[in-house]
């Protein structure tokens, strides 16, 4: 029996063989692709837009940079990056073709198609040469990866020396009472929203569960250091509902 079939991981609160998780996650995002951006606004009350602005503020995109936006889906991060960096180019990599289709349509509407490439690919085995990109971003995607450490190792590989990693992800609130209240909202409201708006309760139940399974801020920072990154720092957003993690290939 090979490692892929003998090892297990989590899919939300379920334990599944590692070899099955990617397909299950692919199914989730294929089903929600057409409603993904609308649901992000509803689930967060639009606050995710402020978090992404904070991500860009800290990242400070520069003209001419090459961005790799992994799990970039509909292109939200890439569009923000390109608007702040004249002459920059973005490659959006996602394992779900239907998410990329939504992104291409948005790029065409915004007349930005010539500054973007769209690639179907796996965060754990990126189809790019080493030392290629100036910036690597992943927004609300890394918690869905089967082996997070492998994805971070790949991020380090494809970045140029001096390149920067920036991760935006849901995280853990340091205050137990606030975490309890947030969990009540997440588990009782978000799946119902998913059923009403996207006719898909199960996918949003998974997304909520996946947030609770993701490592806390300090643990994740340690994983980034383990991949080889230096100057690793993080910033809490909305008191820790989400967090930004930054690291450099030095």
UniProtKB/Swiss-Prot annotation:
It is an enzyme of class 2 (transferase). S-adenosyl-L-methionine binds at residues 74, 94, 122-123, 139. Keywords: Menaquinone biosynthesis, Methyltransferase, S-adenosyl-L-methionine, Transferase, Ubiquinone biosynthesis. PROSITE patterns: SAM_MT_UBIE, UBIE_1, UBIE_2. Belongs to the class I-like SAM-binding methyltransferase superfamily. MenG/UbiE family. Methyltransferase required for the conversion of demethylmenaquinol (DMKH2) to menaquinol (MKH2) and the conversion of 2-polyprenyl-6-methoxy-1,4-benzoquinol (DDMQH2) to 2-polyprenyl-3-methyl-6-methoxy-1,4-benzoquinol (DMQH2). This is Ubiquinone/menaquinone biosynthesis C-methyltransferase UbiE. It comes from Cereibacter sphaeroides (strain ATCC 17025 / ATH 2.4.3) (Rhodobacter sphaeroides).
């Amino acid at each position: 029996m090979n490692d892929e079939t003998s090892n297990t991981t989590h899919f939300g609160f379920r334990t599944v063989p590692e070899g099955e998780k990617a397909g299950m996650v692919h199914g989730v995002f294929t089903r929600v692709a057409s409603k993904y951006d609308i649901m992000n606004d509803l689930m967060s009350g639009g606050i995710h837009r402020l978090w992404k602005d904070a991500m860009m503020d800290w990242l400070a995109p520069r003209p001419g940079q090459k961005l790799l936006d992994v799990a970039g889906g509909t292109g939200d991060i890439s569009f923000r990056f390109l608007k702040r960096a004249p002459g920059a180019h973005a490659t959006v990599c996602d394992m779900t073709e239907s998410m990329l289709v939504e992104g291409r349509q948005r790029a065409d509407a915004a007349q930005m198609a010539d500054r973007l490439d769209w690639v179907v690919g796996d965060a754990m085995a990126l189809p790019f040469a080493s030392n290629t990109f100036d910036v690597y971003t992943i927004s609300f995607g890394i918690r869905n990866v089967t082996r997070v450490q492998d994805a971070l190792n790949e991020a380090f590989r494809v970045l140029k020396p001096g390149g920067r990693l920036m991760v935006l992800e849901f995280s853990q609130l340091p205050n137990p009472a606030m975490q309890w209240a947030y969990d009540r909202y997440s588990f009782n409201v978000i799946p119902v929203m998913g059923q009403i708006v996207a006719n898909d309760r199960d996918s949003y139940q998974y997304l909520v569960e996946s947030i609770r399974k993701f490592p806390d801020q300090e643990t994740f920072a340690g994983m980034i250091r383990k991949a080889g990154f230096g100057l690793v720092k993080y910033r809490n957003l909305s008191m820790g509902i989400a967090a930004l993690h930054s690291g450099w290939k030095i």
